[in-house]
């Protein structure tokens, strides 16, 4: 006989705890104020506007380094979330404090398409190749209108290898 499905509240709590734990591992994410909107297995990064993010006060425009960091954060968290998803859904990842290591950036190329205005920004990453050792990601950022990107990037990442117990 099959086990009855878990209540949806339990599943949502487990997913939210895992995402919070994943984000909490990177202090710079907290400093920038980046959060993630989760819809099923899809994540959207949210960079709430703050005065400290302005790089050019004359325009004003979001600093290019902040834009780049936001895109890279969205890429790394999306890769990590995708790697966790199967364990999370099967219940194998019960403790929200034990996560695999994060992917390491090999290279990251940003295209600045227009100035980031002094308002909230959003980003979504798409994994274009995911292997055991290497992954490629394309990420896009927008503000008011998703069809008007202000930046996009392509990144290549070294995927973490499973830890081997030597007992």
Language-model regions, residue ranges each:
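Terminal targeting signals and extreme-terminal segments of soluble enzymes
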Residues: 1-167
């Amino acid at each position: 006989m099959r086990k009855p499905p878990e209540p949806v509240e339990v599943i949502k709590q487990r997913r939210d705890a895992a995402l919070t734990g994943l984000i909490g591992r990177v202090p710079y994410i907290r400093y920038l104020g980046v959060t993630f909107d989760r819809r099923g297995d899809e994540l959207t990064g949210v960079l709430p506007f703050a005065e400290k993010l302005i790089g050019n006060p004359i325009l004003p425009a979001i600093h290019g380094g902040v834009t780049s960091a936001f895109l890279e954060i969205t890429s790394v968290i999306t890769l990590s979330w995708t790697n966790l998803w199967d364990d999370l859904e099967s219940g194998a990842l019960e403790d929200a404090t034990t996560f695999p290591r994060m992917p390491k950036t090999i290279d990251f190329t940003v295209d600045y398409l227009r100035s980031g205005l002094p308002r909230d920004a959003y980003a979504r990453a798409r994994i274009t190749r995911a292997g055991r050792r290497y992954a490629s990601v394309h990420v896009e950022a927008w503000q008011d209108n998703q069809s008007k990107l202000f930046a996009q990037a392509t990144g290549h990442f070294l995927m973490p290898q499973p830890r081997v117990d030597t007992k």
